[in-house]
Amino acid sequence: MNNLVCPAIAFPSFLDPVIIQLGPITLHWYGLGYVVGILFAWWYAQKLLKKPSLWHKNHPPMTKEKIGDFVVWSAISVVVGGRLGQVLVWDPLYYFSHPSSIIAVWDGGMSFHGGLIGIIIAMILFARKNNINIRSMFDIIAAGAPIGIGIVRICNFINQELWGNATTQPWAVCFPLDPYYLPRHPSQLYEAFMEGFILFMILFIVIFTFKAFKRRGTVSGIFIIGYAIARSISEVYRAPQEDPEWFSTLFHSTGFTYGMALSLPMLLLGFYLLLQAFKDKSTENDTPQRKN
């Protein structure tokens, strides 16, 4: 480690990736973050389903019991999809040469884009099995998802991973695990606020003020677009990750990152959902009208 005095905020010494260890059982903040995020989304969805006036034709798309049934589906799909995305998209050579690390989810290394694909597949299958409108299924899950994302980003900070570029800003943080011990952007916290808490408040406003659930697909479309934009902004401040070789060859020194590239399909999907929402003729007599 560099012994020079770091002109920035020292990483809090009391923050440890491990919460508690009891014999062979170790509880990590990272794993707990996923659990809390999923449980919050479940609780929030139940609250939203209790308000029929928010929904298309004043009819919630499913019962509270059904959303409870989906909790297990969501947990499995997010973890499996997120881990497979990390393994196959970000660092396949490392994981194939260290196969035991593939299941070490508690050490970090989850791809948001992989987790998104996993839960989209789970939502489609669950909605078809239970005769639920797919776009409404997307909406109810998207409404609470940003809080989970924000919590996990804070856990990334605790794990001292995905830190930012070196900076002279007064709020820069020196991470002990950084071999150069440079003052860096706490980009994990930027993402926690942009992808998590700010995006949650935007969705909260469009749900309760503009009754966005009535146009099915609107909330999920805004969520996906909002995440893609926030992620692309945060990529500017993130320290470069080891992108796939083919990508680095094509976009070397352009400032265009792999994370930005993966966000482009999300933008297209988000705009597609919004387009379908506003083309849906069944909502024409259901959306609230402004009074003059």
From Swiss-Prot:
Pathway the protein takes part in: Protein modification; lipoprotein biosynthesis (diacylglyceryl transfer)
InterPro entries according to UniProt: Lgt
Family named by the database record: Belongs to the Lgt family.
Record's protein name: Phosphatidylglycerol--prolipoprotein diacylglyceryl transferase
Function, as annotated: Catalyzes the transfer of the diacylglyceryl group from phosphatidylglycerol to the sulfhydryl group of the N-terminal cysteine of a prolipoprotein, the first step in the formation of mature lipoproteins.
Membrane spanning stretches: 25-45, 70-90, 102-122, 138-158, 193-213, 217-237, 255-275
Pfam families membership: LGT
Organism name: Bartonella tribocorum (strain CIP 105476 / IBS 506)
Gene Ontology process terms (BP): lipoprotein biosynthetic process
GO terms for cellular component: plasma membrane
